[in-house]
From Swiss-Prot:
Coiled coil: none annotated. Keywords: Cell cycle, Cell division, Cell inner membrane, Cell membrane, Cell shape, Cell wall biogenesis/degradation, Magnesium, Membrane, Metal-binding, Peptidoglycan synthesis, Transferase, Transmembrane, Transmembrane helix. Pathway: Cell wall biogenesis; peptidoglycan biosynthesis. It holds the Pfam family MraY_sig1. This is Phospho-N-acetylmuramoyl-pentapeptide-transferase. It catalyses: UDP-N-acetyl-alpha-D-muramoyl-L-alanyl-gamma-D-glutamyl-meso-2,6-diaminopimeloyl-D-alanyl-D-alanine + di-trans,octa-cis-undecaprenyl phosphate = di-trans,octa-cis-undecaprenyl diphospho-N-acetyl-alpha-D-muramoyl-L-alanyl-D-glutamyl-meso-2,6-diaminopimeloyl-D-alanyl-D-alanine + UMP. InterPro entries: Glycosyl_transferase_4, PNAcMuramoyl-5peptid_Trfase, PNAcMuramoyl-5peptid_Trfase_CS. PROSITE patterns: MRAY_1 (PS01347), MRAY_2 (PS01348). It is found in: Cell inner membrane. The keyword Magnesium applies. Catalyzes the initial step of the lipid cycle reactions in the biosynthesis of the cell wall peptidoglycan: transfers peptidoglycan precursor phospho-MurNAc-pentapeptide from UDP-MurNAc-pentapeptide onto the lipid carrier undecaprenyl phosphate, yielding undecaprenyl-pyrophosphoryl-MurNAc-pentapeptide, known as lipid I.
Amino acid sequence: MLYDLIQHHGSAHVTVLNLFRYITFRAGAACLTALAISLLLGNPLIAQLRRIQREGQPIRALGPERHILEKAGTPTMGGVLILAALFGSTLLWADLTDGYVWAVLLTTLSFGAVGFADDYLKLSRRNTAGVSKRMRLGCEFAASLVGGYWMQSLMPADLANHLAFPFLKEWLLPLGFAFPLFAMITITGFGNAVNFTDGLDGLAIVPVIIAALVFGLISYLVGNHVFADYLQLHAVPGTGELCVFCSALVGAGLGFLWFNAPPAAVFMGDTGSLSLGGALGAIAVAVKHELVLCIVGGLFVVETLSVIIQVFWFRRTGRRVFLMAPLHHHFEKKGWQEPKIVIRFWIVSIVLGLCGLATLKLR
């Protein structure tokens, strides 16, 4: 918004206003703005959620026993705070004429709406059964398919239907008409992967922040022909503005972590986890680094695989591979304390983020 106002009404002779033309300046401002919004709205919103929800998020009876004692009464739907900060900051600092920004914003909002409906039904019914799996996946598939097709229409023709591989600078796999389906699987998959990971205080939000930092840099590089050519990346004009979105996501995530750090004052709920995962998937599709997201977001991938393996093996043999799935609950059952699990998973995410950055140079 500010960028568009200055572009159309600002004076080229005012040096300070020229700062708004730089993505790096607006990205930094977006991060700080989102952080400020989160910190300012956090306490009032949490107080309001406590008044409305009273008993807090329903706790799964089959989950770790201590969750019933320690987490009962904690309000959920904290994802509303993340989305408010993310959208407010992005709309303020991003170039709103950029199609990629709108495609990612609306995909994020759509996943957030599905998560909000799921949280609302869980609270109103006072159990952990929200929107039916079929309805939930149907809505996610529809939103991600539209988002994927939208972003495909914005891409250069020589990239639009192709899949790029990390470490390989030249080779592209042509997907043809299947690309929107691939985008749908990527976005929906990561939406649910973050949802699976969000089971302990602070566990999901820090890996999301790390992924947003990495993809903020990637979007800046692939959106700039000079940097893309130097690093031998596939340039995607227009995606540089997603750096502003990613920076806003970092700020919103840090602000939420202020209240979600153990012991959490609020949970993000499906409102937050689905929207954040959907956002990461959409950004990866836009910048043609979907497989790099599997590296950077490897923690989310492993958590999801633990659920798939557990369900498949139990249905096949009647036995469990893990003490409990997702994986973080397995370690809880083994006797690890929650802070140890969370911090060690954060360390893994940092290492995976660095590995993702390494793919930009090792080509």
